[in-house]
Amino acid sequence: MSGVAIHASSWGAALVRISPYTFSAIGIAISIGVSVLGAAWGIYITGSSLIGAAIEAPRITSKNLISVIFCEAVAIYGVIVAIILQTKLESVPSSKMYDAESLRAGYAIFASGIIVGFANLVCGLCVGIIGSSCALSDAQNSTLFVKILVIEIFGSALGLFGVIVGIIMSAQATWPTK
């Protein structure tokens, strides 16, 4: 049993020795990278269905590009939050680098980046799948376009929820004063 406690404490000790700036940089990178991955995945899902359905019904091409724009907005959410998180970075003297306040600020920026990145990944997938359904159903019955577009707007709200939670989390990032 004592081996488990030593192993767990060594992980905690290892995490505390990592610079808070490293956690901050990883959080900012995850915010952008995973958000762009979600947007690209959504565009791929929507675009492939849109191209396939446009063969049968060419009229749907320009109308259903709104789904691609919703997917692009997901990447923009990640970039905006990454800029906000980057403005939270401040220089700290090396004597206060591993203080509790510095570690909390680094972890808060890291958590914000993870929350926003993965919320936008899920949002991109959701908007892509709904956009695909919108293109395929619009090719069959044009009266369904507006109804499914409303559902797509609700799907894109997932990304906005992630942005809001990320901004609230980043408010906890206060670095120690000099």
Curated annotation (Swiss-Prot):
It holds the Pfam family ATP-synt_C. The record marks 72 as: Essential for proton translocation. The keyword Endoplasmic reticulum applies. Residues 46-64, 130-147 are cytoplasmic. The keyword Nucleus does not apply. GO terms for molecular function: proton-transporting ATPase activity, rotational mechanism. The chain crosses the membrane at residues 25-45, 65-85, 109-129, 148-168. It is a multi-pass membrane protein. Its main location: endoplasmic reticulum. InterPro entries: ATPase_proteolipid_c-like_dom, ATPase_proteolipid_csu, F/V-ATP_Csub_sf. It comes from the Eukaryota. Residues 1-24, 86-108, 169-178 are lumenal. GO terms for cellular component: endoplasmic reticulum membrane; Golgi membrane; proton-transporting V-type ATPase, V0 domain; vacuole. SUPFAM superfamilies: F1F0 ATP synthase subunit C (SSF81333). It is found in: Endoplasmic reticulum membrane; Golgi apparatus membrane. Keywords: Endoplasmic reticulum, Golgi apparatus, Hydrogen ion transport, Ion transport, Membrane, Transmembrane, Transmembrane helix, Transport. Belongs to the V-ATPase proteolipid subunit family. Proton-conducting pore forming subunit of the membrane integral V0 complex of vacuolar ATPase. V-ATPase is responsible for acidifying a variety of intracellular compartments in eukaryotic cells. V-ATPase is a heteromultimeric enzyme composed of a peripheral catalytic V1 complex (components A to H) attached to an integral membrane V0 proton pore complex (components: a, c, c'', d and e). The proteolipid components c and c'' are present as a hexameric ring that forms the proton-conducting pore. Interacts with APD2. This is V-type proton ATPase subunit c''2. It comes from Arabidopsis thaliana (Mouse-ear cress).
